[in-house]
C-alpha cells in the first residue's frame, strides 16, 4: 500500500493519504530551536534540550498523535469547523483532501475542504529562537465566506519531570498574559528572562485569545472538538496556575477568489514575541526566512550529488540520507517520537559515528562534536558512555539548566565520570577514524595538535587523545589477546562481563590503521613503530582465536569462562553481523576468509528487508552472553534486522570487490524501496530506522524507531565513500567505486576544499571494481590532486 511519493525536484516527500499507520515525522530547526512534527502536525518544540526547555507539550505513544501545532478553520455561517492538517479534527477523507509535504527542515500542510483551500508551512528561521507558521486561506467558492482561524499549541512546564509528574507543584508554577498581540507564558519559578518565557503571537490583531488550555478545549473535550472553535470565539482566558496554551483567533471575510495570508510565531524569550511580531508583519520577511532554509540545504546537498542507474540510491543520497545524518549530528538521540527528551546528552559511540558522515557539509558541527567527545574522554583512554557536553565546556560549565519546581538532583562529579565497570569497550575507538576523516576533508591538520582537556583532569593534544584510546584497548584484553567486552560493546545487550569481544578487536584494528595513516603523514617514526606492532598483534590474535573453521566465519566473542559465541555447532546465535562485517571492513583479514565470512552473512542473515543482526535468534536465556538472550526473538538486538551495522556489510562487500552483493545489501535496507509496502513497513519511507522486525517475529518487516539512528550516517558514508568510491585524502581525491557489473557508469558532483569536481565514471567492460585510467581536465593522471579553490574540474574515470 502506498501513501505518498518522493518529489525529487523539490526534495520533498509528499503524503497524499494522511491516514498512514503511524506518525511520519520531520525535524524543523538546524540550530537551537527544534520542532519534531508529524504529518498531522502533532509533535513538540523545545529549545536546546527537550529535557530542560520543552516549549510545547507531548504525550508519547498515543494513538491520536497529539497534541501539536494546529490551525483550526471555522465557517462562521454554518458552524462547521476543520483543521488544516487532517488531525486533530479528522474530516472524512471523502469530503476533504489533504496533502503534506515534508521538506528539508520544513513541513507544508494543505487542505481543500468545502470551497476553502488552506496551506500552512512550518519552519524555524536560521538565527531565530522561534518557529514560524506561514498560513494562507483562499476562498475558491463562488460565494463570500466568513472564516475564523484559530492557532493553537499547548505549553509545556519546561522540564520533562514537571510535565509528567509532580503536578502538585507544576500546575501552580506558571501563568499566561496577553499584551500587545502576544500571548506570553511565564514559568514563574525560572528567573531567567530568556528560558523563563515562551510565547505565541501572530501578524494579525487577534479577535480573541486563550491562555488556559481547559478554557480553549473545554471539559470532556479534546483537540478534535475544542469548545472555543465550536463557539467561534475564545474566552480571553489568561491567568496564573493550571494547564496553559497559546490560542489566537481571527475572523476573516473572503470574497470569491480572495486570499488572506498571515504568520503565527512560537518562540522563547521575554519580549521576543513583540520583536518578531513586528518583523514578520512584513510578510516578505517570512519569504526571506523560508528562502534562507532552502538555501541552507541547497548548499549542503550540493557538496555531493550523484546520478546513477539506481533511482532509490540517488534520491536518498542526494537529500534524505544526508538530511537524516545531519539531524543525528545536531540532535543526537534525545528528541523524537520515541526518544522523548528524558536523556539529554551525547552517546559517545553514537556521536563519534554520526560525525564521520558530514564533515563536508557541516565541518563546524563535526569539529564541535569531536571536541565534545574528546572532552568526554578520561585520561585512561575510554569515553564516557553518555554525558552532557556542557559539563566539560568551559563556557557552559557554570550555566545551570532551566529551573524546575520539581526537585531534580544535580549530578556530582562522581556521577558524571564513571569507572571501568560502566565502560563500554567500543566507545572510544570510533573517534579515531572520525578524526582522520575530518582532517582529510578539511585539510585542518592543526586540529591534531590542539590541546583539549580530559574529563577527569589534565589535558593532551588531539593526537595524544587518539593514542590514549588505542592504548586503553590494548591494555584491556583477555588471555587470548582479544579485547575485553567490559559492560558491553556496540551491542548494548551483549554483556560479556569478563568475556572478550571479537567486534571490538576488529574495531581496534580499524582504529589503529586510521591512526597509522595519520602518523605516517606526520612522519612520526616512534608512533609508527609502536602502533604498527600493536596492529600486527591484534591481527594475529583475531586470526588465531576468532575464526570458526567448521562454519567458515568469525565468532562474536567469548564468555568469561572462555566459551565461544557464534560457532557452527551452536543452534542459537550461530552467525553474527558485527564481527564478520568489521573483520572485512577493518582490513584485518585475508580476502579468502573475508569472502567466506560474508558468504555466511548472506546465507544466514540476509532478508528482503536487510541483514539480521544474528541468527538463529536466542531462545534460551544465558546471562554469560547477556541480556540479548532475554529479548524477544526477532526483536531489536536478538535476531532483528538492526539497521546500524548493515552499511558495514556494504563496505565489506565493496572492499572485497563484490559490487552486485554490495548493492543487493544496500537495496534491501533502503527505505525508498519500501514505499509501496507501507502495510508491512509502517514507518516513514524516507528515513532509516533503528531496527526492523526479524524473521522470527510475526511482524517481520515492520520498521521501528525512525530518524535518530547511526544507520543514516553510516549509510551515507558507506555509499559515497565505498560503493560510489569517492574518498578524500590528505592531498588527493580518490575515485575507486565498487558497483554492480551491469552499471554502464554514473556521475558525481563533489565539492572539496572549495573546488568542484564533476566526476564521470564509465564502465565499458562491465566490471564491478578496478580503475583503468583517470583524466583530470583532459589530462591523464595517476592521482587526482587537490585543485585550486573556486575551480571547476572535469574528472573521467574508466573502470576495467
From Swiss-Prot:
GO molecular function: carbohydrate binding; glycosyltransferase activity
UniProt record similarity statement: Belongs to the glycosyl hydrolase 94 family.
Source species of the chain: Vibrio furnissii
E.C. number: 2.4.1.280
Annotated keywords: Carbohydrate metabolism, Glycosyltransferase, Transferase
Keyword Glycosyltransferase attached: yes
Catalytic residues in the record: 492 (proton donor)
Residues bound to N-acetyl-alpha-D-glucosamine 1-phosphate: 333, 343, 349-350, 490, 492, 637, 644, 690, 709-710
Role according to the record: Catalyzes the reversible phosphorolysis of chitobiose (N,N'-diacetylchitobiose or (GlcNAc)(2)) into N-acetyl-alpha-D-glucosamine 1-phosphate (GlcNAc-1-P) and N-acetyl-D-glucosamine (GlcNAc) with inversion of the anomeric configuration.
SUPFAM superfamilies: Galactose mutarotase-like, Six-hairpin glycosidases
Protein name: N,N'-diacetylchitobiose phosphorylase
Presence of keyword Metal-binding: no
Assembly mode: Homodimer.
pH sensitivity of activity: Optimum pH is 6.5-7.0.
Temperature dependence: Optimum temperature is 20-37 degrees Celsius.
GO BP term, pick one: carbohydrate metabolic process
Gene: chbP
Alphabetized InterPro entries for the sequence: 6-hairpin_glycosidase_sf, 6hp_glycosidase-like_sf, Carb-bd_put_dom, Gal_mutarotase_sf_dom, GH36_catalytic, GH94_Enzymes, GH94N_ChBP, Glyco_hydro_65_N_sf
Reactions catalysed according to its record: N,N'-diacetylchitobiose + phosphate = N-acetyl-alpha-D-glucosamine 1-phosphate + N-acetyl-D-glucosamine
Binding positions (N-acetyl-D-glucosamine): 492, 636-637
